[in-house]
């Protein structure tokens, strides 16, 4: 068994992770059904509920601010014990004055799930929190509310990178967060494979996650750490954008060298398609679109017969850890195969010696860049995952496309469009399925991105921190420039 422990840090991260967990739950099979190719034990843990029944809950720790959990309770129906109404007042004989915050009303969707009834269709009006479309029970240890800050507070906003850094330091000093929150899940694993971390990178959660990753690397040594770093893509004032860029610069400088995979994700993406319908102001919508790519590209980590995800990411030299997330989507047309707009090799593989720059795929959705960079970028390494299109149906074409590339085992299950997804997001989708080509790509575009952050850091950040940060970003940038300007050097590897 190769288990993965997940950490979810903040509101935007929890919107994305909730879609991820709902999709994992949709793969469950029950008595009499064919065994799923997905190994559920990778992300889920067995346990025992309060009444002695067996439970199966996500192996995750969910952090968020006060007021951000909506109607999600720490103790749910699986783990709560019925309170004894006849309990006395103990040693206190005086009057009690109980002050309670007005409870958040449960949505009709959650009420129907609890009652075992068909759930109504979700809308942007009915989804107020990420918990409004959550379909799973979590272990009480998974729910960690940080009471020092309140969601969307105007008095104490959780925006500055240093605020998150200081909050982690204070909490870790008081509670030892790894020992309290992570170790119980890690010690249950037969063989811990990786730690997956969802976070935002352009606000205070960037500082919080940076210090968390420091502790994780110290504690778990060479274990893989995969970071999905979400950043705002909506237009904001110049001052706000500069603050976000400073936060992003600090986050990528602090986390990317410590991680095995660091993927910046723009939410919402800058460019979309006419066949993709979503509300860019709804985090429920935008993270559903992101999850279609993120969940698909990590599918190999959950398959019973696939164990090469890390080696595929590492490529030839293992030096490139910052990856772009990209995808193309078509509707599942019930058997009439649609070709996705891709050029070059279609295998699930890392870039080969045959010339990575010549085997670029043209993706419809780019979740990492805004399209302003160079179109003539060089690919150092790429992992592609197909869902819903059986390439072996056209064996002659596949044989030609695979020349020079190692073949990997393929699974062709379409990506599910679950009930908690926004309806009609993908035009023409049938049977609640879509075909997806998703990819993680390490390319020279990263150098352009970091160069922009270097410029911002050099102009705005204080003198005490400026030299260290700018030089550190420069070293990261150089690793995405060196070695590709001369094609013969690459092909001689």
Swiss-Prot record:
<dbReference type="InterPro" id="IPR019605">
    <property type="entry name" value="Misato_II_tubulin-like"/>
</dbReference>
<dbReference type="GO" id="GO:0007005">
    <property type="term" value="P:mitochondrion organization"/>
</dbReference>
<dbReference type="InterPro" id="IPR049942">
    <property type="entry name" value="DML1/Misato"/>
</dbReference>
<keyword id="KW-0496">Mitochondrion</keyword>
<dbReference type="Pfam" id="PF14881">
    <property type="entry name" value="Tubulin_3"/>
</dbReference>
<protein>
    <recommendedName>
        <fullName>Protein dml1</fullName>
    </recommendedName>
</protein>
<comment type="similarity">
    <text>Belongs to the misato family.</text>
</comment>
<comment type="function">
    <text>Involved in the partitioning of the mitochondrial organelle and mitochondrial DNA (mtDNA) inheritance.</text>
</comment>
<dbReference type="GO" id="GO:0005739">
    <property type="term" value="C:mitochondrion"/>
</dbReference>
<dbReference type="InterPro" id="IPR029209">
    <property type="entry name" value="DML1/Misato_tubulin"/>
</dbReference>
<dbReference type="InterPro" id="IPR036525">
    <property type="entry name" value="Tubulin/FtsZ_GTPase_sf"/>
</dbReference>
<dbReference type="Pfam" id="PF10644">
    <property type="entry name" value="Misat_Tub_SegII"/>
</dbReference>
């Amino acid at each position: 068994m190769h288990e993965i422990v997940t950490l979810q840090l903040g509101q935007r991260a929890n919107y994305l992770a909730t879609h991820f967990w709902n999709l994992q739950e949709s793969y469950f099979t029950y008595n009499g059904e064919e065994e799923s190719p997905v190994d559920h034990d990778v992300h889920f843990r067995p346990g025992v509920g309060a009444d002695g029944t067996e439970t199966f809950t996500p192996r995750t720790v969910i952090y968020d601010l006060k007021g951000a959990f909506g109607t999600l309770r720490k103790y749910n129906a699986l783990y709560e014990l019925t309170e004894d109404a006849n309990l006395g007042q103990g040693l206190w004989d005086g009057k009690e004055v109980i002050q309670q915050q007005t409870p958040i009303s449960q949505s009709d969707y959650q009420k129907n799930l609890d009652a075992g009834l068909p759930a109504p269709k979700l809308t942007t009006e009915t989804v107020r929190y990420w918990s409004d479309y959550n379909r799973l029970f979590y272990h009480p240890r998974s729910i960690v509310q940080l009471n020092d800050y309140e969601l969307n507070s105007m008095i104490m906003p959780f925006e500055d990178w240093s605020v998150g850094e200081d909050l982690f330091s204070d909490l870790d000093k008081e509670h030892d967060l790894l020992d309290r929150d992570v170790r119980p899940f890690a010690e249950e694993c037969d063989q811990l494979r990786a730690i997956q971390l969802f976070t935002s990178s352009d606000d205070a959660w960037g500082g919080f996650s940076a210090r968390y990753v420091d502790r994780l690397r110290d504690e778990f040594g060479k274990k893989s750490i995969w970071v999905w770093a979400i950043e705002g893509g909506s237009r904001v004032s110049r001052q706000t954008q500069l603050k976000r860029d400073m936060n992003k610069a600090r986050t990528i400088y602090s986390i990317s060298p410590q991680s095995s995979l660091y993927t910046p994700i723009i939410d919402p993406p800058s460019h979309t398609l006419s066949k993709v319908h979503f509300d860019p102001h709804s985090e429920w919508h935008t993270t559903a679109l992101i999850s279609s790519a993120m969940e698909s590209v990590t599918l190999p980590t959950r398959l019973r017969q696939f164990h090469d995800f890390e080696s595929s990411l590492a490529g030839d030299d293992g030096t490139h850890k910052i990856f772009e997330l990209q995808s193309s989507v078509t509707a599942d047309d019930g058997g009439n195969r649609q070709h996705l707009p891709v050029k070059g090799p279609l295998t699930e593989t890392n870039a080969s010696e045959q010339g990575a720059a010549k085997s670029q795929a043209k993706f419809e959705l780019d979740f990492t860049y805004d399209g302003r960079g160079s179109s003539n970028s060089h690919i150092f390494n790429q992992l592609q995952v197909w869902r819903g299109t059986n390439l072996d149906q056209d064996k002659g074409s596949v044989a030609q496309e695979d020349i020079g590339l190692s073949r990997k085992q393929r699974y062709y299950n379409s990506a599910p469009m679950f009930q908690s997804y926004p309806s009609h997001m993908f035009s023409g989708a049938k049977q609640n399925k879509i075909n997806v080509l998703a990819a993680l790509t390490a390319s020279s575009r990263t150098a352009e991105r970091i160069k922009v952050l270097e410029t911002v850091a050099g102009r705005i950040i204080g003198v005490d921190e400026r030299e260290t940060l700018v030089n550190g970003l420069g070293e990261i940038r150089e690793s995405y420039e060196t070695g590709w300007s001369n094609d013969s050097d690459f092909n001689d590897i």
